[in-house]
Amino acid sequence: MQHSGNRRVVAACARCCGFIHSVPLQLEVIFGESRFAPLLAALGDLPQRWQVSAGEGPASVVRCAQGCGEIYCSEACRDAHFQQSHNLLCVGPLSEDHPLLRFKYHALEHADTLLLAAQVFAFLINRAKAAGGGPEVTRNLMQELLCFCHAPFREACRPPPGRAKDAEFYAHTDGLVNQAAALLRAALEPHAPVEVGALFQAGSAFFSEVLGMFEYNNIDLEVASPMGQLLLQRAKALSLSDGQALAELQQMEGLLREKEWVMRCVWGEETTGIYGDEVDEDSSQPQEMDTMMQAMEQGNDEQVVTAAMAHARAEVAQMSLEQLLQGVWPSMHGTGLFSSVARMNHSCAPNVKVTFPGNSSRLTTTSVLNISPGDELCICYVSQEADVQTRRRRLLEYGFTCCCSRCLAEDSTALRKAQKRLK
């Protein structure tokens, strides 16, 4: 599932999370603010021509037939999504006071994974009904899902930085989950009262367990944007001796400068869904948004925000066309539960890594070390670049203290350095 904040800058398929093959739409999304209307208008039909020049064919977008706003990369993805869960979760024909809409507003305010849990519940209902329906079939599917590591959400979730898991935190978390579960139950019950009754037989307990399962097992999805390579190839194909081609290149340069400014102003935790010490410190994608967004949300001095945006504009003005063409475009960021990865154990020196090649959320595991028959495949649950203390702190959330060979070696190194400083 694509993170809700990421939808502000990337148009991705609601089912497979691949980029929508429409240059005009991708530009409309990233330049969605009214201030960019003149920029898009000045481009005219260039985005469509760039689309065709890349061999993509005319831009086309497949939308939900019921008008909810969901978009897809193909009719096949749209139809499959509708059959799996969207038939029960589409808000297109609903009134503003419908519990499903209220649930989605609640989820957008508090946690994206509430939306993913709703997809799981709708999927279970559809599977149960396809298998004949009834409470027993539903309960069997529930047990099948809980074969993965799980716990109530209040135990599995990570509190914000500086916040302790105290009575106030537990009360807030339980209230959030209970309200979401009540709204979702009210939304789904008219469609399948027997199956929904089984899902909520213990109140919000199963809903909370599913959310906890996501906390322990979900991995971050990242699908690279095709926009950068598309425009780079187009720029290389233009002849600088041709006046029309030169004019097109100048318009492309103006677009790229605005994109770089947007990346510096609106790219960060909100649009990636990666918070706190999960952020890769070596990431090439700018993180200036975090400070500016926090300043705006907290009502801090508007001059601070204005100055930061002006600084970003000045930085972009110094970039050459070659640098602009090499610049990063927003990736699709999301979260997902993958059964194969959810069954893998942790190692701080893993022998496989997870990647998402191509334009979709299809997962591939690739070996990073030599693997012999009988070896266990392990991934790293946390950032491999983090130091041993940070890794261990994060791994405590999974319920264990790591004592692998790498951790022990780094412990010894840290101890020797500390002893040397004391001498």
Task: Report each predicted region and the residues it spans.
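Short alpha-helical interaction motifs and adjacent low-complexity tails used for partner binding
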Residues: M1-K423
